[in-house]
């Protein structure tokens, strides 16, 4: 996806320090202090324009949410949605997923959402996929024993790749749907991409998984 560069995005984000965390590394191990409570922290990696993470924060005030999107020109749209949602349990961060361990302490994150991640279809780009074992190693360190990864995509190839990657990593698959919108699953909050692709008749794939610590 080609992103239109917005040279003013960084300044706009920094105008809202109550939402946008400019230096998340400063709060490693201290995110409960950022939110002012002991509620669990959930993160979405690749938040895009923020429809999902804002919707989740509004629907679940007892959970703290952090939307992570490395492109500031995209994250600024998530900022607008966060402002509109008018919630106190949402923060936004501009960082690459490879740097998550610089921002969060071991076991500090209760749940991770991966929604419509870039499929990186070329074989030479496999390591860039957010469900690649390199990233799974990072997630395993961030999540506590009961922590889960929730993954949604419209891309069948990426979903099949992820099923194999999770299984080979010895993860436990606790939920799998090959057509989410025609399943019994309740409480789904759609992303912008999800609305777009489902409107065209594409099935949405979803799974939940956790690490087998035994």
Swiss-Prot record:
SUPFAM superfamilies: S-adenosyl-L-methionine-dependent methyltransferases
Catalytic class of the enzyme: transferase
Entry binding sites for S-adenosyl-L-methionine: 44, 69, 96, 118
GO annotations of cellular component type: tRNA methyltransferase complex
Catalytic residues (positions): 118
UniProt: substrate binding residues: 122, 154, 191-194
Origin superkingdom: Bacteria
Keywords: Methyltransferase, S-adenosyl-L-methionine, Transferase, tRNA processing
Pathway, per record: tRNA modification; N(7)-methylguanine-tRNA biosynthesis
Protein name: tRNA (guanine-N(7)-)-methyltransferase
Gene that produces this protein: trmB
């Amino acid at each position: 996806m080609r992103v239109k560069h917005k040279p003013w995005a960084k300044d706009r984000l920094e105008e809202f320090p109550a939402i946008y965390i400019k230096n998340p590394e400063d709060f490693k191990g201290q995110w409960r202090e950022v939110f002012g409570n002991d509620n669990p922290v959930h993160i979405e990696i690749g938040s895009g324009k923020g429809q999902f993470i804002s919707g989740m924060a509004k629907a679940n005030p007892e959970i703290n949410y952090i939307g992570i999107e490395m492109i500031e020109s995209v994250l600024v749209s998530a900022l607008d949605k966060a402002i509109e949602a008018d919630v106190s349990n949402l923060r936004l961060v501009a960082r690459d997923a490879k740097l998550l361990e610089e921002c969060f302490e071991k076991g500090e994150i209760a749940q991770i959402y991966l929604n419509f991640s870039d499929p990186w279809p070329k074989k030479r780009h496999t390591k860039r996929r957010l469900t690649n074992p390199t990233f799974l190693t990072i997630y395993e360190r961030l999540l506590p024993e009961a922590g889960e990864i929730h993954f949604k995509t419209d891309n069948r190839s990426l979903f099949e790749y992820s099923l194999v990657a999770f299984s080979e990593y010895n993860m436990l698959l606790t939920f799998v749907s090959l057509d989410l919108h025609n399943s019994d699953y309740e409480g789904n909050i759609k992303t912008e991409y999800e609305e777009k692709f489902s409107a065209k008749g594409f099935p949405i794939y979803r799974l939940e998984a956790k690490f087998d610590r035994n």
